[in-house]
């Protein structure tokens, strides 16, 4: 059974995708699939649910931020590292709000990306918070409101 982590690499540049895929797979730690545009990212995430998405912010079709908005609607979307040759404070803030784990400005060293990828998989899983309904029900019970009144 293959124990490698699955990575979806999304970038508009075929040359960049190819070179980065080769460097990442060379480690033997990751299996890499590629996407050329935002719509393909959404399709592949839905079909394969990768462990990690490494995505450029500037994609054809849907840009990276729009893809992140769509992925946020899913329950178990992949962890995400966002890359871009263009950096703005607004984009960084929005990416952070949408749950991006890391932002890497281009150009970057492949080893830097690999360090970030490895670090994400070594972190302890985040504690999941109870749903709003569960929390409201708990509070209602604590204050003694009958269960049929909500």
What are these regions (language model features)?
Residues 34-52:
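Acidic, metal-coordinating helix/loop segments flanking the phosphotransfer/catalytic sites
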Residues 37, 63-66:
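Acidic catalytic/metal-coordinating carboxylates
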Residues 43, 65-76:
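Short amphipathic alpha-helix used as the core "switch/output" element in two-component signaling
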């Amino acid at each position: 059974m293959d124990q490698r982590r699955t990575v979806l690499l999304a970038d508009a540049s075929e040359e960049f995708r190819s070179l980065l895929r080769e460097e990442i797979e060379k480690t033997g730690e990751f299996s890499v699939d590629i996407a050329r545009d935002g719509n393909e990212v959404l399709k592949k995430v839905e079909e394969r649910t990768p462990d990690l998405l490494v995505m450029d912010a500037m994609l054809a079709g849907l840009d990276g931020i729009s893809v992140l908005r769509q992925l946020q609607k899913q329950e178990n979307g992949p962890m995400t590292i966002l890359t871009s040759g263009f950096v703005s404070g607004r984009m960084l803030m929005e990416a952070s709000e949408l749950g991006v784990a890391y932002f890497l400005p281009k150009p970057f060293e492949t080893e830097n990306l690999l360090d970030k990828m490895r670090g994400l998989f070594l972190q302890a899983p985040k504690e999941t918070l109870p749903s709003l309904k569960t929390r409201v029900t708990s509070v209602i019970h604590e204050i003694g409101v009958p269960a049929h009144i909500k």
